[in-house]
């Protein structure tokens, strides 16, 4: 087992728990915010087990997923905007619960939690299908176009999973106000996709043909 990789993964995992916990519970002013605990559970429990599986079976893939440093200025801006949206959404959700502004019914929260878990399953399938998947936009040595499985339906199934994941999170937190804020993620990710397709079409053999054969980017028949 790669102890360095394990250490890096654990540090990022624990830092993520601490960061999300602060963003959710500090504005809420209480640990009684059960929707916050639900989000922590559906977010970090599957993440923990996925990390163990990747560490054991696909350490190179885990290493790529841990690397979030973008090289291009445009993508750095996309990452910064995404971080701002997350911060505003989580803080607003905590304040929404604390001051009882507009709380969603429990059935909506649990339905959103189920959608979140579904998005994790989609994400796991994408990781299984594409060994070249990284968090940064780049063309890797020996990379090939993947056009089977989910990639035969949409060109960016990872973003299909993340759109479901990110839009369901504020609903898990019971905050429609946070959901409205998180809708800003759609134009942000659209900007990232445009840039990514430019990079791939210029640097990855066969990608232009793939774009012609698979029409939809993220959501079948819609986007």
Positions of predicted regions on the chain:
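Membrane-anchoring alpha-helices and their flanking helix-loop junctions
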Residues: 1-148, 160-223
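Histidine-centered phosphotransfer motif of kinases
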Residues: 152-160
């Amino acid at each position: 087992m790669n102890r360095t990789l394990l250490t890096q993964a654990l540090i990022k995992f624990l830092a993520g728990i601490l960061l999300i916990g602060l963003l959710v519970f500090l504005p809420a002013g209480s640990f009684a915010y059960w929707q916050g605990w639900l989000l922590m559970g559906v977010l970090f429990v599957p993440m923990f087990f996925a990390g163990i599986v990747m560490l054991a079976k696909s350490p190179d893939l885990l290493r790529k997923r841990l690397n979030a440093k973008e090289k291009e200025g445009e993508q750095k801006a996309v990452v910064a905007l995404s971080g701002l949206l997350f911060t505003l959404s989580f803080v607003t959700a905590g304040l929404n619960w604390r001051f009882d502004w507009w709380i969603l019914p429990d059935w909506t929260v649990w339905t959103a939690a189920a959608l979140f878990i579904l998005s994790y399953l989609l994400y796991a399938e994408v990781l299984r299908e594409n060994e070249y998947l990284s968090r940064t936009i780049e063309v890797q040595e020996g990379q090939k176009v993947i056009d089977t499985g989910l990639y035969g339906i949409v060109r960016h199934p990872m973003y299909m999973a993340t759109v479901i994941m990110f839009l369901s999170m504020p609903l898990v937190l019971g905050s429609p106000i946070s959901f409205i804020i998180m809708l800003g993620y759609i134009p942000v990710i659209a900007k990232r996709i445009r840039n990514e397709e430019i990079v791939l079409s210029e640097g990855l053999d066969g990608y232009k043909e793939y774009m012609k054969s698979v029409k939809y980017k993220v959501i079948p028949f819609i986007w």
